[in-house]
């Protein structure tokens, strides 16, 4: 880790007040990072010092010893660090990952007593990016992390998956009406169908809130189904009451958690969840009236998140549609309603102007949502 210029008095205060994470035996050349910073580990690396208290995301990628250019997938984990706290971890050489099991208390206390001597092997936390990190995580609490992180606590860019059925023998494939492995494949679709169904290894998947696929209540009339398909407030309220009964604002912590897992953890599934959750929030006009403070904070969150991603990132490479502009177009249209809180309405107007100036996104064209909506009715629901 490269040396950083820091005011001596500030450095002294941070040394005594900040938290320390010690990671023993991490191999030289490993890509290691904390929050918005990453480095290539040198031979003397033992961890990071002067870390401000709070939630942090540590991430790393192992490197092939025989071929240092071969870098493994990103892995990471969240830590909630206390003032003057000390966390002692070690590298598991067999699994090529950081062992997150707690170190014996005696070892921690011995390490604490030896911190002055260990100081030369600890890199200082880069305070130049602290404000950016806080802006991306200010709604992520310890409870958010405990609720969402995998049971293993390790967040992996590529999930470890296992086949739902082993199908080790030909008779197993026959039982599932699948052809023999040696049979010629006649089409791409047939090839896909032959692939085994996979599932994440137990304890390794991020435990995101389940989002509804049906946006209307059971027994809804055709008119109600259409209304709830245009304004997703019913579906959003279902999520808020079920997943965040104590504080609806906590949904923003999950939105930030998903974004960090994607941006710094390279977890594509987290990006997909972020999109689905954002879509639900932005297309809920009635909820904007009821939860105006939640939406004021949502705008602030999006302001910081969108500053970290290229403007064309959200454009579908096939359809050329931009998920974000179409979603925010509906949001800005709803925010103009006279029923919406004035503070929220004004903040939405300023945010729209900011995005138009920065990304040259057009939000004035008529939203596709204004076109007639074709809704699939459940079985048993008549139109007469």
Curated annotation (Swiss-Prot):
Decide whether keyword Acetylation is in the record: yes
Q: Which UniProt keywords apply?
A: Acetylation, mRNA processing, mRNA splicing, Spliceosome
Q: Which cysteines are joined by disulfide bonds?
A: none
Highest taxon listed in the record's lineage: Eukaryota
Output the GO biological process annotations, alphabetical, semicolon-separated. spliceosomal tri-snRNP complex assembly
Q: Name one GO cellular component term.
A: spliceosomal complex
**Which residues are recorded with the post-translational modification N-acetylalanine?**
2
The answer to whether the entry has keyword tRNA-binding is no
Give any Pfam family that matches: AAR2_1st
**Matching Gene3D superfamilies:** 2.60.34.20, Aar2, C-terminal domain-like
Question: What function does this protein fulfil?
Answer: Component of the U5 snRNP complex that is required for spliceosome assembly and for pre-mRNA splicing.
Which family is this protein grouped under?
A: Belongs to the AAR2 family.
How is the quaternary structure described? Interacts with PRPF8 (via RNase H homology domain). Component of a U5 snRNP complex that contains PRPF8.
Its name, as the record gives it, is: Protein AAR2 homolog
Its ancestry begins with: Eukaryota, Metazoa, Chordata, Craniata, Vertebrata
């Amino acid at each position: 880790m490269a040396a950083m210029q820091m005011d001596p008095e500030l450095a002294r205060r941070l040394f005594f007040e900040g938290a320390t994470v010690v990671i023993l035996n991490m191999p030289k050349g490993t890509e290691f990072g904390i929050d918005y910073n990453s480095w290539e580990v040198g031979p003397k690396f033992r961890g990071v010092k002067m870390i401000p208290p709070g939630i942090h995301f540590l991430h790393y990628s192992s490197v092939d010893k025989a071929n240092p250019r071969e870098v493994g997938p990103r892995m990471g984990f969240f830590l909630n660090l206390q003032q003057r706290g000390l966390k002692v971890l070690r590298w598991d050489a067999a699994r090529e990952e950081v062992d997150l099991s707690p170190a014996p208390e005696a070892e921690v206390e011995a390490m604490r007593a030896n911190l002055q001597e260990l100081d030369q092997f600890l890199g200082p936390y880069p305070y130049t990016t602290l404000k950016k990190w806080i802006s991306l995580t200010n709604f992520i609490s310890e409870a958010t992390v405990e609720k969402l992180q995998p049971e293993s606590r390790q967040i992996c860019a590529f999930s470890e998956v296992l086949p739902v059925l082993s199908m080790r023998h030909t008779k197993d494939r026959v039982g599932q009406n699948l052809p023999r492995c040696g049979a010629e494949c006649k089409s791409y679709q047939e090839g896909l169908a032959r692939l085994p169904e996979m599932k994440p290894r137990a304890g390794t998947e991020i435990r995101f809130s389940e989002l509804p696929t049906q946006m209307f209540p059971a027994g809804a009339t055709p008119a109600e189904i259409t209304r709830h398909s245009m304004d997703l407030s019913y579906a959003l309220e279902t999520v808020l009451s079920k997943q965040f009964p104590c504080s609806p604002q906590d949904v923003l912590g999950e939105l930030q958690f998903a974004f960090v897992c994607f941006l710094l953890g390279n977890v594509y599934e987290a990006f997909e969840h972020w999109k689905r959750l954002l879509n639900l929030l932005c297309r809920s006009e009635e909820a904007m009236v009821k939860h105006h403070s939640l939406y004021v904070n949502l705008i602030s969150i999006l302001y910081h998140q969108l500053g970290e991603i290229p403007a064309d990132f959200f454009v579908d490479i096939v359809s050329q549609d931009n998920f974000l502009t179409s979603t925010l177009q509906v949001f800005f249209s709803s925010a103009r309603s006279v029923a919406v809180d004035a503070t929220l309405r004004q903040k939405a107007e300023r945010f729209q102007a900011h995005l138009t100036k920065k990304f040259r996104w057009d939000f004035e064209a008529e939203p596709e949502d204004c076109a007639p909506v074709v809704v699939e009715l459940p079985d048993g629901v008549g139109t007469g």
